[in-house]
Amino acid sequence: AEDELGIGTDHQGIMVLEPEAVVGTAAKDYLGLKTDTIFEIGLTPNRIDGASHIGVARDLYAYCKLRNIPVEFALPSVEGFSKGEGESIPVRVEAPDLAPRYIGITIKGVEVGPSPDWLKERLMMIGQRPINNIVDITNFLLNENGHPLHVFDAAKIEGRKVVVRRSTPNCKFVTLDGVERTLSSEDLVICNARNPMCIAGVFGGEDSGVTESTTDIFLESAYF
């Protein structure tokens, strides 16, 4: 099965190859697998700075520099991105003690679909299941820089505003897994003009999630 080979999540049974598959062809060549190395790093609680790819790379850079080992790195280009003309979604933080920093950006004209193979492969290498390009890239960035992101369907943000506040007592909220949960006034929630959309830093809501029909998104980055 795909999951047993580490190339997918399907566990329905033995993989059936296409009729044109030539007997004797190496599975690596037929499946287009790349030769790579995965490092499994055991972190102690005091080294949370290493709980990301960039965190590990930063430590390796220091190690190499002390030993005069040349290291090359490249910063990603951000050319081609420009500020749009549309109206932005304002953010109001009503619980700064629980959310000292909250920022967001609206991105329009996205197309939700399968991720490219390179992204799927990198997520599966670290034990994560690819879902779609929007969810996958946020998970990829989480593991790359150690900071979580969350995406809302911008069209589902009632009142075109985002409010960060404490929940009202005994508030009923349905999370992405379809389970109704009861919140307390100790819970921090991300809301639209009327209702909660997300339990901050914990679980997204069923009514604000990205679907195949999503075209505009609101991307959240916060410190809770």
Question: For the regions a protein language model found, what residue spans apply to each?
Answer:
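Glycine/proline-enriched, intrinsically flexible loops and inter-domain linkers
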Residues: 70-171
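Structured core elements
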Residues: 38-42, 49-55, 59, 104-106, ...
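A general secondary-structure signal for short beta-strands and their flanking turns/coil
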Residues: 34-38, 86, 100-102, 214
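Conserved mixed alpha/beta core segments that line enzyme active sites in large multi-domain catalysts
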Residues: 24, 121, 138-207, 212
